[in-house]
């Protein structure tokens, strides 16, 4: 096991250096917004809120804020989400949304369904790896990297509905964990 600890420690060091060079600032957020609008412009939501036109503007953020209204969950659910949940394709996101995370929330509806797209799952996976790479900064001993880890999350029980699967976000993410996590 010591060799595994050494290998993982070295990997976190390399990942940390790469991520530190990238930096996370406004430019990256703007790129993410542009990419999201670009990806969703051919959806019904993108058509109604003129995503094609937003992308032609110099100030995408201001134009997006001007074109897309702020609404509460109940209004968004009624106008957009219920059709996606019913299986509508290209409605709020490209393709059909297969997963919905359940949230009790604090306002409005007693139970909320939050769309979880394939892109979102991949993003969670990338962020998890980046967080892991930050361990390098803690200068932990090699033994740490081969020790057992306790991960705490919500229920991994997912419920299959006619058009989608729903459950706790942690359960959806666990289903898409790229490598098995052995139980000690």
Placement of each model-derived feature along the sequence:
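Nucleotide 5′-phosphate-binding alpha/beta core
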Residues: 1-102, 108-184
């Amino acid at each position: 096991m010591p060799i595994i600890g050494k290998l993982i420690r070295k990997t976190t060091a390399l990942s940390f250096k790469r991520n530190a060079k990238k930096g996370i600032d406004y430019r990256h957020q703007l790129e993410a917004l542009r990419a999201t609008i670009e990806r969703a412009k051919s959806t019904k939501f993108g058509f109604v809120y003129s995503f094609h036109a937003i992308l032609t503007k110099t100030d995408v953020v201001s134009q997006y804020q001007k074109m897309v209204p702020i609404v509460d969950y109940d209004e968004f659910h009624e106008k957009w989400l219920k059709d996606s949940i019913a299986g509508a394709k290209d409605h709020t996101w490209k393709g059909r949304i297969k997963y919905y995370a359940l949230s009790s929330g604090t306002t409005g509806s007693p139970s909320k369904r939050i769309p979880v797209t394939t892109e979102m799952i991949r993003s969670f996976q990338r962020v998890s790896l980046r967080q892991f790479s930050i361990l390098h900064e803690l200068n932990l001993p090699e033994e740490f990297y081969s020790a057992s880890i306790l991960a705490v999350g919500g229920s991994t029980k997912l419920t299959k509905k006619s058009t989608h699967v729903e459950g706790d976000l942690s359960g959806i993410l666990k289903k898409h964990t790229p490598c098995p996590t052995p139980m000690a």
